[in-house]
Swiss-Prot record:
Protein name: Aspartate carbamoyltransferase regulatory chain
Record's keyword annotation contains NAD: no
GO biological process entries: 'de novo' pyrimidine nucleobase biosynthetic process; pyrimidine nucleotide biosynthetic process
Any one Pfam family match given in the protein's UniProt record, by short name: PyrI
Function recorded in the entry: Involved in allosteric regulation of aspartate carbamoyltransferase.
Family to which this protein belongs: Belongs to the PyrI family.
Essential cofactor(s): Zn(2+)
Gene Ontology CC terms, in alphabetical order: aspartate carbamoyltransferase complex
Keywords carried by this UniProt record: Metal-binding, Pyrimidine biosynthesis, Zinc
Record-listed Zn(2+) binding positions: C109, C114, C138, C141
Subunit structure and binding partners: Contains catalytic and regulatory chains.
GO MF annotation list: metal ion binding
Gene from which the chain derives: pyrI
InterPro entries: Asp_carbamoyltransf_reg_N, Asp_carbamoylTrfase_reg, Asp_carbamoyltrfase_reg_C, Asp_carbatrfase_reg_C_sf, Asp_carbatrfase_reg_N_sf
């Protein structure tokens, strides 16, 4: 028995595909990591069916390639995501994500008293992973937060 599968999001010729993003996280990743700061076409799939997790988000950015450092920063919120480099409609490289040691100039400290809110400094967090839990420690106020608290601290 054969089954026909139809792409729900158009293929790209050249660029980056971030796949297997947890559902409801795709838009936040676009915003946090400034993935829309480009003139290139971006295709977003939200709540797509996934055999792995039931539902997923997907981001395709044409003619743009993420560095390994940029891809690893995504791992904090989409640890099972895959980041694929596409060339001539083919996957030419798959990046394996791992948590970075630091994340700079991306996130906002949830502590409203932190100097990073009032001084001209870039935010900076040390990433800590223990027993499957991810936390972030602010360089300035030295408070530690669950990574999801920082995700929603805009």
């Amino acid at each position: 028995m054969t089954q026909d599968y139809k792409l729900q999001v158009e293929a790209i010729k050249c660029g980056t595909v971030i796949d297997h993003i947890p559902a409801q996280i795709g838009f936040k990743l676009l915003s946090l990591f400034k993935l829309t700061a480009t003139d290139q076409r971006i295709t977003i799939g939200l709540n797509l069916p996934s055999k792995r997790s039931g539902r997923k988000d997907l981001i395709k950015i044409e003619n743009t390639f993420l560095t390994e450092q940029q891809a690893n920063q995504l791992a904090m919120y989409a640890p099972d995501a895959t980041v694929n480099r596409i060339d001539n409609y083919e996957v030419v490289k798959k990046l394996t994500l791992s948590l970075p040691e630091r994340i700079d100039a991306v996130l906002t400290c949830p502590n409203s008293n932190c100097i990073s809110h009032n001084e001209p400094v870039d935010s900076s967090f040390t990433v800590k992973a223990q027993r499957g839990e991810i936390s972030l420690k602010c360089k300035y106020c030295e408070k530690e937060f669950d990574h999801l608290a920082v995700l929603h601290a805009d």
